[in-house]
Amino acid sequence: MPEYCLLCHASASGGICRDCLDDLCRSAVAGSQSCPRCGGIGDGISPCGGCQRKPPPFEKLWSSLHYEPPVSGLLHEFKHLRQIALKRLLAELMAALPPPWLHNAGIDGILAVPLSRERLVERGFNQCGELALLLSARYGLPLLPEDTVFRRPAPPQSTLPYARRKKNVAGLFRVAGDVKKRNLLLIDDVATTNATLAELSRMLKQAGAGNLYCWTLAQAKMQKS
């Protein structure tokens, strides 16, 4: 990482200065205004109406930041322009705004949301895996092997309208590793409709996993159109 802030270019270690980090933290996703189950709009205490009607297959979802500039730009450079050195900065942003339940949820392993083999070859790395590796080392939680879950090829969720996203992920994952009774932390980069995390959680539960928790770098808003 450069010895200057990537946002304001002031002298800094780790790619971000304290002032910019504080500014980002002030614009973080407010847990007091979010559903504690799915991360959507809520009162921060009780599950939202949607979760009460149909609880998701994971216990809780937490997003550290909103998917908006400068976070969206940094993530684009990381994923699509292959600026892999940004992984440390992005993991640091997540660690600056961790889930409030992280240390008391009984989590015994971390699993990165996998890419399909084709997408992995195309991109050269799994952005979620890179973040998960750093978070695993930071919190002393074992990272499950990449071949724990396989993902079939499918159009990227970001290219699809809201109505097609749930159908697009149906049957997307196949669990190959032993996850029985494991309480897992799933790491993803962006949560929008939560369809991918919900489908992955559903398949893990079918394979015998215990409680599942989700942590994403950012949360994006999407119109249901």
Located regions from the model:
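Glycine-rich phosphate/pyrophosphate-handling loop used in enzymes and phosphotransfer proteins
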Residues: 1-188, 192-225
